[in-house]
Amino acid sequence: MRSKFKDEHPFEKRKAEAERIRAKYADRIPVICEKVEKSDIATIDKKKYLVPADLTVGQFVYVIRKRIKLSPEKAIFIFVDEVLPPTAALMSSIYEEHKDEDGFLYITYSGENTFGDC
């Protein structure tokens, strides 16, 4: 899936920003979180997050649910490289495994399990 953030900001600018963030906040992970285009779930109010390295994927999902004011009975799925990451995984390990060449971790979310298997 194409990232709107990548389309709107040149590579050099993204890379410099991620490097600056990592230098200033070594214990935080720069994350870009965007909605899967065709999903009917609410659009998030901000795309950029500085996530504590020891946060789990499940805790990050909770943050996203709160930001889009998603009711408890509604499902939300997050994807990293079009794959559902394990809920108990630390964001730091997901970052090390899947960070983009610009230094950001790109996460997409959807109300449907649109990629792969659970």
Swiss-Prot record:
Residues 117-118 form a propeptide. The C-terminal 2 residues are removed by ATG4 to expose Gly-116 at the C-terminus. The C-terminal Gly is then amidated with phosphatidylethanolamine by an activating system similar to that for ubiquitin. It is found in: Cytoplasmic vesicle, Autophagosome membrane; Vacuole membrane; Preautophagosomal structure membrane. Its main location: membrane. It comes from the Eukaryota. The record marks G116, D117 as: Cleavage. The keyword Protein transport applies. Gene3D superfamilies: Phosphatidylinositol 3-kinase Catalytic Subunit, Chain A, domain 1. GO terms for biological process: autophagosome assembly; autophagosome maturation; cellular response to nitrogen starvation; mitophagy; protein transport. The keyword Lipoprotein applies. GO terms for molecular function: phosphatidylethanolamine binding. GO terms for cellular component: autophagosome membrane; cytoplasmic vesicle; fungal-type vacuole membrane; phagophore assembly site membrane. It holds the Pfam family ATG8. Keywords: Autophagy, Cytoplasmic vesicle, Lipoprotein, Membrane, Protein transport, Transport, Ubl conjugation pathway, Vacuole. It is a lipid-anchor. A lipid is attached at G116 (Phosphatidylethanolamine amidated glycine). Ubiquitin-like modifier involved in autophagosome formation. With atg4, mediates the delivery of the autophagosomes to the vacuole via the microtubule cytoskeleton. Required for selective autophagic degradation of the nucleus (nucleophagy) as well as for mitophagy which contributes to regulate mitochondrial quantity and quality by eliminating the mitochondria to a basal level to fulfill cellular energy requirements and preventing excess ROS production. Participates also in membrane fusion events that take place in the early secretory pathway. Belongs to the ATG8 family. This is Autophagy-related protein 8. It comes from Emericella nidulans (strain FGSC A4 / ATCC 38163 / CBS 112.46 / NRRL 194 / M139) (Aspergillus nidulans). The gene is atg8.
